[in-house]
């Protein structure tokens, strides 16, 4: 595969810089990520984040009607607590701050540390964990967050934009997350910038059912079916 990259180590930061350059009226760069270029004071702020490589998430989700800021880690790696703190401080609008992310150990640790630091400064900061991946655990609240991030964060952001208070927004997040389920199938692994081999491989004619977005093991491999058969697998697998 042919790729156009500079130094692979700089890929995430250059991707963010390019996005900001393309949309300077909407995005402002800060340490660790981006925030909205225009401020709306006295509203609950929503900051989303996670590892880079899931484009357009997470920086591409910042703007009117969506997130107030995004924390962008290295490729498939959790942002640091200091990055999360810096973006959250820049995004805070004085009415409480919500930090939304998929349920992954590194994100839980680092975003949690940032929230603790913000609370010590008098900011009502709370973490929102998306848990939609039915392949990852039997208990809904222990599952990973995958494609469900998008609808869950969008509805949550709309509640923030309406001027709901932080308790109302959290209640809406809980309802939407509780009603969101995802299941993925993989046909091939991606090749990360600077790597020579794919992150994982799936045998020709097979599909990996339930594989995670970073190549985490799924439920099983099975024969690749037709579009209708794959759709039925995704829609009717029990959670």
Spell out what each predicted region is.
Residues 70-75, 119-142:
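Short, acidic/small-residue loops that bind anionic groups at enzyme active sites
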Residues 136-143, 153-214:
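Internal, active-site/partner-interface "lid" segment
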Residues 1-46:
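N-terminal amphipathic/basic leader segments beginning at the initiator methionine
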Residues 54, 61-93:
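Glycine-rich oxoanion-binding loops at beta->alpha junctions
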Residues 42-49, 58-71, 136, 207-223:
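Gly-rich Lys/Arg/Thr-decorated short loops/hinges at beta-loop-alpha junctions or inter-strand turns
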Residues 236-239:
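Conserved small/polar residues in nucleotide/adenosyl-binding loops
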Residues 108-121:
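Short Gly/Thr/Asp-enriched flexible loops that form oxyanion-binding sites at enzyme active sites
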Residues 51-56, 102-110, 145-149:
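Gly/Ser/Thr-rich loops at beta-strand to alpha-helix junctions
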């Amino acid at each position: 595969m042919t790729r156009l990259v500079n130094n692979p180590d700089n890929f995430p930061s250059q991707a963010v810089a390019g996005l900001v350059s393309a949309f300077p009226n909407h995005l402002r760069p800060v340490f660790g990520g981006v925030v909205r270029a225009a401020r709306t004071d006295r509203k609950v702020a929503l900051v989303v984040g996670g590892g880079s490589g899931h484009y357009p998430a997470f920086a591409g989700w910042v703007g009117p009607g969506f997130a107030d800021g995004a924390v962008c880690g290295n490729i498939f790696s959790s942002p640091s607590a200091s990055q999360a703190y810096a973006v959250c401080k820049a995004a805070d609008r004085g009415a409480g701050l919500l930090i939304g992310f998929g349920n992954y150990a590194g994100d839980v640790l680092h975003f949690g540390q940032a929230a603790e630091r913000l609370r010590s400064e008098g900011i009502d900061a709370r973490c929102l964990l998306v848990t939609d991946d039915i392949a990852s655990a039997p208990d809904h609240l222990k599952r990973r967050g995958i494609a469900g991030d998008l609808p869950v964060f969008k509805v949550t952001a709309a509640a923030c934009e309406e001027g709901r208070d932080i308790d109302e927004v959290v209640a809406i997040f809980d309802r939407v997350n509780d009603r969101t389920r995802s299941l993925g199938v993989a046909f091939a692994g991606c090749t990360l910038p600077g790597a020579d081999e794919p992150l994982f491989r799936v045998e020709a004619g097979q599909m990996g059912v339930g594989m995670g977005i970073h190549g985490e093991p799924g439920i099983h491999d099975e024969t690749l079916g037709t579009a209708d058969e794959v759709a039925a697998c995704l829609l009717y697998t029990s959670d």
